[in-house]
C-alpha cells in the first residue's frame, strides 16, 4: 500500500489515542483516526512507515451498529468531539478495552502480572459537564463573517461557531452568543494566523459546577489602531452582564497576547469587572481558580476520581487517617 492510495475498510477496533484500525477487503490494515468500531470508511493513505499505513478519513460510508445516539448539531464539522453518536456506556466499554490493552502491552495481562483491574468509573453527568472552554475567534470560511467557537475537524484556520454545544451548559452558550453578537456589530477584526494582523483572539469561559460562579477572559492583541479600546471593552462588559444566567458572574477580564502561536498566552491581564478568580468545591474542599489555573474540566468527574483514590488510601479503616493530611503533588490548583 503506497502513499496516496484511496481505499475502503471496516474499522475493527480503536486503539489509544483515537487510532481506528480499518481492515480492507484484501486484509490490509490502515490506521484511520476519528473512527468508530464497525464503521465502513473511505480513506486516503498519507503516511507509510515500517510497513504500517496511516490514512486520512474521507467519508463514513456506513454507520457503526454502536451509533444510536442523536449528536450535537455541530457534530462532524466541529473537531471537539468524536463519539457523541455512541451511547455513553458503550464509550466506557471502548475506553476499558483501550486501557487494558495499554496495560497488557506494558506489563502483561491480569493473569500474567497479577494486577487487579477495577473497571472504568464514569462521569455522573453525560452532557453539559465541562467547567472550562477556550473559544477561538476567526471565520467559518475564507473572508467570511466573524465566527467564535472551535476549529473545524482537520482545519487549522476555519472555525465552527458552536452556539449549541452540548458539553457545556446554557450559560456558556449565552456568553458565546453575546460576545459574537457584540463584536460582529462593531466590526472588530480577529487575529489572522497567516498575516498576524487583527485584534480578537480567544474567549476563555470558566464556571464552577458547585458554586455557580462564572469568570470570562477576553484575549486580544495590542493592535488597537482605529479602535477605542476602553470604550469597546466597556461595551463588552455591559453586553455580558446584562444577559440572564443561571450562575453568577464573578469576573470579566481582558488579557493581552501578541504571540504569533495559536495558544492562549498571558502577557498582561486587567480586571474589567469583579475579581480575577472564582471558587469551586470538590469533596468539601474549596479551590481558588483563575483563567489560567490547571484544574479538572469535569468537576463531578474529578470528585469520582479523587474519591476512588481516597478509598485506596483509607481501605476499610476510614478512621485511621482522620485529621491527617494527604498531599497531592501533581494536581495543578490542588
Stretches found by the model and what they are:
Residues 1-334:
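Accessory RNA-recognition modules of RNA-modification enzymes
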Amino acid at each position: 500500500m503506497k502513499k496516496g492510495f484511496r481505499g475502503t475498510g471496516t474499522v475493527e477496533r480503536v486503539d489509544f489515542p483515537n487510532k481506528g484500525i480499518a481492515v480492507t477487503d484484501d486484509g490490509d490494515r490502515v490506521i484511520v483516526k476519528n473512527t468508530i468500531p464497525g464503521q465502513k470508511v473511505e480513506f486516503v493513505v498519507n503516511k507509510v512507515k515500517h510497513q504500517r499505513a496511516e490514512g486520512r478519513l474521507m467519508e463514513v460510508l456506513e454507520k457503526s451498529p454502536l451509533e444510536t445516539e442523536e449528536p450535537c448539531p455541530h457534530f462532524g464539522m466541529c473537531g471537539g468531539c468524536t463519539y457523541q453518536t455512541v451511547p455513553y456506556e458503550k464509550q466506557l466499554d471502548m475506553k476499558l478495552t483501550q486501557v487494558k490493552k495499554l496495560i497488557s502491552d506494558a506489563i502483561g495481562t491480569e493473569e500474567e502480572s497479577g494486577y487487579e483491574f477495577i473497571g472504568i468509573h464514569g462521569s455522573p453527568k453525560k452532557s453539559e459537564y465541562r467547567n472550562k472552554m477556550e473559544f477561538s475567534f476567526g471565520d467559518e470560511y475564507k473572508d467570511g463573517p466573524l465566527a467564535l467557537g472551535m476549529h473545524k475537524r482537520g482545519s487549522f484556520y476555519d472555525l465552527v461557531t458552536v452556539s449549541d454545544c452540548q458539553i457545556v451548559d446554557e450559560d456558556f452558550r449565552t456568553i458565546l452568543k453575546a460576545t459574537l453578537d457584540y463584536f460582529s456589530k462593531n466590526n472588530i477584526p480577529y487575529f489572522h494566523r497567516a498575516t498576524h494582523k487583527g485584534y480578537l483572539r480567544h474567549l476563555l469561559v470558566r464556571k464552577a459546577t458547585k458554586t455557580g460562579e462564572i469568570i470570562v477572559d477576553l484575549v486580544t492583541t495590542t493592535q488597537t489602531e482605529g479602535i477605542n479600546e476602553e470604550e469597546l471593552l466597556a461595551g463588552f462588559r455591559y453586553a455580558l452582564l446584562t444577559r440572564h444566567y443561571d450562575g453568577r458572574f464573578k469576573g470579566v477580564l481582558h488579557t493581552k497576547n501578541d504571540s504569533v502561536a495559536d495558544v492562549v498566552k498571558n502577557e498582561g491581564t486587567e480586571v474589567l469587572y469583579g475579581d480575577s478568580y472564582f471558587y469551586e468545591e470538590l469533596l468539601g474542599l474549596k479551590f481558588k481558580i483563575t483563567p489560567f489555573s490547571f484544574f479538572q474540566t469535569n468537576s463531578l468527574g474529578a470528585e469520582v476520581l479523587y474519591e476512588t483514590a481516597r478509598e485506596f488510601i483509607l481501605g476499610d479503616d476510614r478512621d485511621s487517617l482522620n485529621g491527617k493530611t494527604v498531599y497531592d503533588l501533581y494536581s495543578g490548583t490542588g
